[in-house]
Swiss-Prot record:
GO terms for biological process: proteolysis. SUPFAM superfamilies: Macro domain-like, Zn-dependent exopeptidases. InterPro entries: Leucine_aapep/pepB, Macro_dom-like, Peptidase_M17_C, Peptidase_M17_leu_NH2_pept, Peptidase_M17_N. This is Probable cytosol aminopeptidase. The keyword Ligase does not apply. It catalyses: Release of an N-terminal amino acid, Xaa-|-Yaa-, in which Xaa is preferably Leu, but may be other amino acids including Pro although not Arg or Lys, and Yaa may be Pro. Amino acid amides and methyl esters are also readily hydrolyzed, but rates on arylamides are exceedingly low; Release of an N-terminal amino acid, preferentially leucine, but not glutamic or aspartic acids. It is found in: Cytoplasm. The keyword Cytoplasm applies. Belongs to the peptidase M17 family.
Amino acid sequence: MNFFIKSCFLDKEKTDCIVVSVFELSELSDSAIYLDKCSNGHITSLIKLGDIQGKIGDTLMLYKVPKILSKRILLVGCGKKDEINIIRFKKILKNTIHAIKKKSIKNIVYSFSNINIDNIYWMIRRMVLSLKESLYETIKINNTNIKNTNIHSITLNIIKKNDLFIAKTALKHALAIDHAITSTKNLSNLPPNICNPLYLSYKAQELSKKYENNIVVEIIDIKKMKELGMNAYIAVGNGSKNKPFMSVIKYSGNNIVNKKIIAFVGKGLTFDSGGISIKPALHMHEMKYDMCGAAAVYGTLIMAAELQLPLTVIGILSGCENMVGSHSFRPGDVLTTMSGQTVEILNTDAEGRLVLCDSLTYLERFSPDIVIDVATLTGACVTALGESVSGLFSNNEELSNQLLHASQETDDKIWSLPLFSEYHKELNSNIADFSNIGRGKAGAITAACFLSKFTKKYNWAHLDIAGTAWKSGKKSGATGRPVELLCQFLLNQSNYIYN
């Protein structure tokens, strides 16, 4: 499916369907008014019949409108003009796709005027990403009857010709971000018998082939991990026949404008049984999503390469599998991490932080200025923030504010939580430097406190996406979060101007 940007006369467009907005009390948008005048009031006469009120959720398909070359016009209700926000706008777009999917419509022109949710850049970007999200379908394994959408092209009509350049920039960014989100979803949704740590390393190596001028990949296998002293990482994978692999993706842009080295680390537990501290059977199948952090980092690096961002970005996919076996690590073990710090294991289901701590230490060799780890780390974060908001922790206020700003821009909600010294005390151990879980409450915070002990040499932030990375139930599947937020963070670091 292709997207296009242009400024056109709607009555002259030979297309299958033109989509225009109608507000409450049957108030027409400027685009609808233009088509109404061209058709000698045909649209107004039909609206007077009362088939559409302009409320959000309303749609009305018109056929063979006089003096209009398009085969159809879809009127879509947008509610009250001054009450449209990002959430309602996404719902409006979803309603249009729902109405169009029922028809054999291949080519569409959207002409949304009088919707002032933001400047033209953000309006176009939100439109493209929302439409793409509405059209996304999970790939079924070995399904020969894949039903793709009938839609071949979507054209976004720009009312003011002066806005064409920025609109085309928005489209370029949106398509790259969608590529990142879709790649993240597709990888996250794979079953664990396909997507194991070795498979993650293959996916990383594919990037170095596709973007050979900008991306170099190094794979750290268990032999190299042993040489590096990554004992915590290794211990987590000891119970599985699928050995751990850490994929290091190095992206170097052309004409770099920001000299900072930015690094992302993604938790890549391709399946987490909990180990000896085994999880309950109910919902254990969803633990294939415990690698969504790594998938998000993978997707974000794709966007950087697609847009040729003028940055240096490192992405680590910390691939591992936590299984029960005769070689599994145990509660009571004491592990010496790559940093030299020792950890008492109180719970083998608190394994993600053990993989991440050695990955965070490994990153020191690159002298990064910014490190952001992304992990489905704790159920406690889901308890605290629910399934709509990710947890944010950081040792640097400026970095925290930059991520919060990107969150507001993308409507990918995050919430900052503290790392007070009182929480660190919960990790005290009598036999090691600290334990791998807290002995009290605030599990999301104590997990972040654990990670912070390995991030003293750079500015660091931790995103706990345990509640937001996937959805359960009838419409289960990966959400692709927080990829757009991370992409926006990189765009902001690239000093892009959107107005």
